[in-house]
Protein backbone atom coordinates (compact mmCIF):
# COMPACT_ATOMS: atom_id res chain seq x y z
CA UNK A 1 0.00 0.00 0.00
CA UNK A 2 0.00 3.58 -0.50
CA UNK A 3 -1.89 6.33 1.31
CA UNK A 4 -5.59 5.70 0.82
CA UNK A 5 -5.41 1.91 0.70
CA UNK A 6 -7.29 -0.12 3.29
CA UNK A 7 -5.18 -2.97 4.66
CA UNK A 8 -6.54 -5.95 6.59
CA UNK A 9 -4.49 -5.22 9.71
CA UNK A 10 -5.81 -1.68 10.07
CA UNK A 11 -9.04 -0.01 11.06
CA UNK A 12 -10.79 1.29 7.96
CA UNK A 13 -11.19 4.70 9.61
CA UNK A 14 -7.67 5.17 11.00
CA UNK A 15 -5.47 8.02 9.82
CA UNK A 16 -2.02 6.79 8.73
CA UNK A 17 -1.44 9.45 6.09
CA UNK A 18 1.35 11.86 6.96
CA UNK A 19 2.04 10.16 10.28
CA UNK A 20 4.62 7.76 11.66
CA UNK A 21 2.14 4.88 11.75
CA UNK A 22 3.54 1.91 9.83
CA UNK A 23 0.26 0.74 8.27
CA UNK A 24 -1.53 2.40 5.36
CA UNK A 25 -5.17 3.16 6.04
CA UNK A 26 -7.86 5.15 4.28
CA UNK A 27 -9.85 7.91 5.89
CA UNK A 28 -13.30 7.28 4.45
CA UNK A 29 -14.37 10.92 4.37
CA UNK A 30 -11.18 11.89 2.50
CA UNK A 31 -10.86 8.87 0.22
Swiss-Prot record:
Keyword DNA-binding included in the entry's annotation: no
Gene Ontology cellular-component annotations: extracellular region; host cell postsynaptic membrane
Tissue occurrence: Expressed by the venom gland.
GO molecular function: sodium channel regulator activity; toxin activity
Disulfide pairings: 3-17, 10-23
Alphabetical keyword list: Disulfide bond, Ion channel impairing toxin, Ionotropic glutamate receptor inhibitor, Knottin, Neurotoxin, Postsynaptic neurotoxin, Secreted, Toxin, Voltage-gated sodium channel impairing toxin
Top-rank taxon: Eukaryota
Localisation per UniProt entry: Secreted
Function: Insecticidal neurotoxin that reversibly inhibits the N-methyl-D-aspartate (NMDA)-subtype of ionotropic glutamate receptor (GRIN) and inhibits inactivation of insect sodium channels (Nav). In vivo, is highly toxic to insects.
Family per record: Belongs to the neurotoxin 03 (Tx2) family. 05 subfamily.
Protein name, as recorded: U13-ctenitoxin-Co1a
Organism (species): Ctenus ornatus
Organismal lineage: Eukaryota, Metazoa, Ecdysozoa, Arthropoda, Chelicerata
Amino acid sequence: GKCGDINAGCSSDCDCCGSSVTCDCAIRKKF
